[in-house]
């Protein structure tokens, strides 16, 4: 009788556990950084260029293997801005094998644009070569909110802190150039996080340096130091824009 009683089932039933599948191959195989990349857009952020207040968006690209991130600023949410930002990312980080994203309109249209351009080529050999070498797009299932955690988790790391920081600062004195620099500073901070914890025993005479995504991207074991000086809240209203950015960067790091 208990299994047919709805009230008893709620009171005595065991909670349903989340069934997790194995990690995909792109998360476990050693490959060059950003060979498999997840992409998403976050924002918006209000900036003031000259006397005009505008909205800007952040484009996040994360490596599925090294968990490194790369940020770009989008002036709009249309396909043209996305393609230009994607091409600039590829010029910096190198070619991407697979690009994972949700079913955003700008992502889908960009995939169709690239495929249409290859089909319009007149030379068969060039068309065949590009069709095998170009980046392939992989979209998550529509209305599947449980998918895309690879990039959604990285967006949460940045968006929640950055949005709260800009609101608490109560300032709209940041222009697009300053926002770009701030996102790059945040990118460096996020990529400096260690993969695992490290322990330092008493018999060790050296400092144990943890492995970070920045080590894999730059092949250097030294972190970028901030510029010398003390940055305080009055710097938000300074005419020196670089001091505004450095103050916000220090606040982001402390949170």
Where are these regions (language model features)?
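Domain-scale segment recognizer with a strong primary affinity
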Residues: 5-8, 112-113, 127-255
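Secondary-structure transition/capping motifs at alpha-helix termini
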Residues: 49-53, 64-65, 89-97, 128-135
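Amphipathic alpha-helical
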Residues: 1-38, 251-255
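Acidic, Ser/Thr-rich peripheral helices and adjacent loops at domain boundaries
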Residues: 25-30, 112-127, 131
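Active-site beta-loop-alpha junctions of metal-dependent nucleic acid enzymes
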Residues: 71-95, 119
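Flexible loop/turn segments at secondary-structure boundaries
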Residues: 7, 45-48, 68-69, 78-81, ...
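Acidic/histidine-rich, metal-coordinating catalytic segments
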Residues: 91-114
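An active-site-proximal beta-strand-loop segment
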Residues: 27-70, 75-77
